[in-house]
Amino acid sequence: MRDRLLAAEKVKAIDWRDGALHLLDQRVLPFEENWIAYTSAAGVAEAIRSMVVRGAPAIGISAAYGIVLAARARIAEGGDWYAALEEDFMLLADSRPTAVNLFWALNRMHDRLDRLKENADPLAALEAEAIAIHESDREANLTMAQLGVDLIRKHQGNAQAILTHCNTGALATGGFGTALGVIRAAFIEGMVERVYADETRPWLQGSRLTAWELANEGIPVTLNADSAAAHIMKTKGVTWVIVGADRITANGDVANKIGTYQLAVNAMHHGVRFMVVAPSSTIDMNLASGDDIPIEERDGAELLEVGGKRVGADVEAFNPVFDVTPADLIDAIVTEKGIVERPDTAKMAQLMCRKRLH
């Protein structure tokens, strides 16, 4: 399976080369494939904030490389570069509030800095750590893909229809994808007849990114309006809803792209299984439940402007980027450490005590 998954890789969104972070600008896909090179932490923070790069794992990886760029600049300035670097950590941490992978990656970079031996090269150590974060996410993607396929096969091994939301593929990660990685692997195994992709308003990650990724790999994909999901579950034989996550709390509640919660409610009503796929770096054991997750809200103009024109002068918009799906609506959480079925606090704690499977 691993070799076939690697052979199927066609898309990547993050490239570290020649001392710069190169990001595929996801704001203009699929109409343009435009790579932007970043050489400063401020540039990387803005790329995260403006959604040049998006997807929780990809954000964390980008932030790690951002610290490498920051350290290079601070060391070149001279003086107390270590203290000055704290400003860059804070700048990157403030770029997106909900995706915990961002804070996980920054904490890991900070820990590596704190563990530097005397006379060690800090820049080389930080670069090696960022590359390790990138590579570990790629390996986690491969492990989760296999585990997800095993779970699908456990319940129903024949070709089936799957519904997904937002974008959780190579564009959102450092490798093959989380939820979309499972879907890709299931297709390779002959277990996917068709994928229904929610358009995912207002940024249209489903129509612009997911449909593009799947079509590029020859996986049958049907794009649908977000509001059609329940009807599709009822009439199109969907057996699984498979999504990613931006943060998972200690009790198994999941914050993901806005619209995920209603998918879980509809899946429960229609007897459709609901799978969340995310690396263990997405799990925040410091938060007891989804009630504690900060939910990012973006500019209402994303909803109020149609074709470049405002819909109404007196109309207000509520534009949360994420919602929280309660654990009791989730059939399984798949991570590189293993699978938690019917998640709860005890099962999540047990999962996080395990070593990685890859």
UniProtKB/Swiss-Prot annotation:
Gene Ontology MF terms in the entry: S-methyl-5-thioribose-1-phosphate isomerase activity
Enzyme type, top EC level: isomerase
Residues given in the record as substrate binding sites: R54, G55, A56, R96, Q205, N256, K257
Pfam families associated with the record: IF-2B
Pathway: Amino-acid biosynthesis; L-methionine biosynthesis via salvage pathway; L-methionine from S-methyl-5-thio-alpha-D-ribose 1-phosphate: step 1/6
The enzyme's E.C. designation: 5.3.1.23
HAMAP family cross-referenced by the UniProt entry: Salvage_MtnA (MF_01678)
Family of the protein in this entry: Belongs to the eIF-2B alpha/beta/delta subunits family. MtnA subfamily.
Active site: D246 (proton donor)
Record has Iron as a keyword: no
Organism: Pseudomonas fluorescens (strain Pf0-1)
Site entry (Transition state stabilizer), positions: C166
Protein's gene: mtnA
Protein task: Catalyzes the interconversion of methylthioribose-1-phosphate (MTR-1-P) into methylthioribulose-1-phosphate (MTRu-1-P).
Alphabetical UniProt keywords: Amino-acid biosynthesis, Isomerase, Methionine biosynthesis
Disulfide-linked positions: none
A Gene Ontology BP annotation from the UniProt entry: L-methionine salvage from methylthioadenosine
InterPro entries registered for this protein in UniProt: IF-2B-related, IF-M1Pi, IF_2B-like_C, Initiation_fac_2B_a/b/d, M1Pi_N, NagB/RpiA_transferase-like
Protein name per its UniProtKB record: Methylthioribose-1-phosphate isomerase
Catalytic activity annotation: 5-(methylsulfanyl)-alpha-D-ribose 1-phosphate = 5-(methylsulfanyl)-D-ribulose 1-phosphate
